Amino acid sequence: MQPSLFSEFEIPFKNKFPSTRYQGSKAKFVDWIWNEISNIPFQTALDAFGGTGCVAYKLKDNGKSVTYNDILPFNSIIGKALIENSSTFLSPSDIDFILTEHSEINYPTFIADNFKEIYYTDEENHWLDVVRYNISTIRDEYKRAIAWFALFQSCIIKRPYNLFHRKNLYVRLIDVERSFGNKKTWDTPFEIHFRSFVEEANHAVFDNGANCYAISKDALTIENRYDLVYIDTPYINEKGVGVDYADFYHFLNGLVYYDNWSNLIDYNSKHHRLKREYNIWNDKDNILTGFSRLVEKFQKSILVFSYRSNGIPSVDSLINLLERNGRHNELHFSQDIKYVLSDKKSKEVLIISYPE
């Protein structure tokens, strides 16, 4: 194993990746990650747990044929807008159509009827019902994906903590002196946020000359072969508490599944989350088995694990797993980093693992 230390530098995107408030984004580490892997010879790459898409975008920005994957439907749509899309933009007339309440349309009212006083005001819930429907009528899949991206980011930025983990609209509305949050951002109309995020997404679209794709699968079921597979699974801390992105962003998946949303909601939850499904990446007792299956699935690929120094399983456990599979491994460490809503520091760890 060859350890290396993080140093201060910046390798900018040639193209502009959009801003995001998404929890767990690797945006602050993406230049460091690319610096560590840029000398590896590879052309095809899979971002197996794509999230915001910032790593896949960095790979695309450097001419790689990238496949973005995320099991969450709303994330895969973001991947379609920013990674797979090479030349399609959302025009001013498209935007005006999306943001107009058309008198001839009988709009559904599911959000207004079911999410009153949970996440947004009555006026905002009505706006979401209208705009979501308008987006669904756009025929071009890439234009539609850009519109979805803008809607998702607008929803996130107007939420306290940028999450949908509890019923807490009152945090936005209560008249108190605040030591956190951004009330101005929360109170900015959806339309303004939407237009801003469309502009960012349009500026992010480019053709790198290679074929890029966005898919939505369980990473353990992906069959194609890739030169390099980047793996950034949901994080379980040393106390065994995992990050459940499906729970944090259930509302965005609900928007995607709008017509079937009522059948997916756990009505015993105050915030109307979606019914939970088992996820091996949130199970501290079985997550190592998940990693073992990934290593076996992509045994002929270079594997790049983005990890935390205090995660479960431990870094040593992962290294032992890789060595048992006859792989040669390098360890790279970032500086100590303090994460939002946490008092503890940890290091970002990059494990680069080569096949026999």
Task: Write out the residue ranges for each language-model feature.
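Conserved proline-anchored active-site loop of SAM-dependent methyltransferases
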Residues: 33, 45-59, 68-73, 224-245, ...
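SAM cofactor-binding core of SAM-dependent methyltransferases
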Residues: 44-107, 113-116, 130-136, 145-148, ...
